[in-house]
Amino acid sequence: QGSKVIVMVTDLRESGKPKCERYFPENGEGVEYGSIHVETTQVTSYGGYQQRILAVKLAEEEVYDNDDGTEQNDEQTEEEPEVRYITHLQCKRWPDHGVPKSTSAIFRLYYKMLEYRPRDCEAPILV
């Protein structure tokens, strides 16, 4: 879909219990989901939310040994895979129950979301 922004409006835990599965890697780590490699390259904490930069690319091809001891890739190419950068914004101040007492944190997150999505972009924002 070409999305450039993901907005997460919940925390991973609520009242000490798991609320949402972590679907993004820790800062500096990478995870493979099938043929897709996702790496969190940066995390910045703001007042009521966190911003992560996710680098997304095709996973490296598997290398295996031939019968003669040489290595072979499934796909012989020297090109580096294209990397797409996605901004992940996570609201950290939404209470476990009810609504926030102040709307300032959610509005800051909203304006940051707009900052990372160009006006001429037709790709959806994932929430």
From Swiss-Prot:
Reaction catalysis annotation: O-phospho-L-tyrosyl-[protein] + H2O = L-tyrosyl-[protein] + phosphate
GO MF, one example: protein tyrosine phosphatase activity
Regions of compositional bias (Acidic residues) in chain numbering: 63-81
Record's keyword terms, sorted: Hydrolase, Protein phosphatase
Disordered as annotated region, ranges: 63-82
Alphabetical list of SUPFAM superfamilies matching this protein: (Phosphotyrosine protein) phosphatases II
Family statement: Belongs to the protein-tyrosine phosphatase family.
UniProt name for this protein: Tyrosine-protein phosphatase 2
Organism: Styela plicata
Lineage: Eukaryota, Metazoa, Chordata, Tunicata, Ascidiacea
